[in-house]
Amino acid sequence: MNPPKSAPDAQGLSYRDAGVDIDAGDALVDKIKPFAKKTLRDGVLGGIGGFGALFEVPKKYREPVLVSGTDGVGTKLKLAFHLNKHDTVGQDLVAMSVNDILVQGAEPLFFLDYFACGKLDVETAATVVKGIATGCELAGCALIGGETAEMPGMYPDGEYDLAGFAVGAVEKSKIIDGSAIAEGDVVLGLASSGIHSNGFSLVRKIIERANPDLSADFHGRSLADALMAPTRIYVKPLLALMEKIAVKGMAHITGGGLVENIPRVLRDGLTAELDQRAWPLPPLFQWLQQHGGVADAEMHRVFNCGIGMAVIVSAADADEALRQLTEAGEQVWKIGTVRASREGEAQTVVV
């Protein structure tokens, strides 16, 4: 059977006519290879571009357990589009996953990213991936692969979405699951760099209501830069701490804030009582609360309120842990203690 003949005046269609530019995709791969190369570490087998990425678990592990995490950047991307600022969201993407797997004691080994858009802008995508590589360097993990999906009609021009995937390893005997947490333990709070990557739907609503000048000075930088500050990556100082001190539990303070994330590592019958006077509420959160009329309780369940990671140790280890983390460059406060829960009480209370 012969194929149907084209009409004499019909023009042949190409993938580019359909909105997908293969040449742009190839150009992006060439641009990002040097960024990925800077993240290489022991265990990486092969380079970018294969069907699958290969990684050999380091031989230092006797009984390695793999720990995986995946996340995105949420509606912080909407603010990035509005500001045309794409250099920090890549670090946000890495931080959200590596900080999550870190809380179980895992050393991040490698990271993969997914970049989806309607029309690929090579420069914008390369800027995002450069930020991803920066995040991987800060976390000590390798950027070993990813996917760039150009899907015409799926996203408005100038917009994209991101997803990240991190895999780490922890010695089976050293998994941190919160089971050792007991009454009298101390909750340390490590400072956040800002809003991080959660609560931006509320942030954007507050901006809509307040209509501020985002380019105006805000404590030494623009308000836009304060809002877009990349999520802090806690991997290296906390891995070093775990080598010296028995860390009983950790909580990455993401969506749900302090009051919904700390309970994820507490056994039934235990409550973390946090003293909100123990650490300063950063000016950016004060600005959000003031301009949005946000209640204290809502602030604590939406935003990190200045604490990006909670670390639980015994009272005997608290001072030494605080000293080590401070020497490593972290701002740290004793923000609370663990005690027996009272009837009907939440597992984390802020007083």
From Swiss-Prot:
One of its GO terms (cellular component) is cytosol. The keyword Zinc-finger does not apply. It comes from Burkholderia thailandensis (strain ATCC 700388 / DSM 13276 / CCUG 48851 / CIP 106301 / E264). It holds the Pfam family AIRS_C. It is an enzyme of class 6 (ligase). It is found in: Cytoplasm. This is Phosphoribosylformylglycinamidine cyclo-ligase. NCBIfam families: purM. The keyword Cytoplasm applies. GO terms for molecular function: ATP binding; phosphoribosylamine-glycine ligase activity; phosphoribosylformylglycinamidine cyclo-ligase activity.
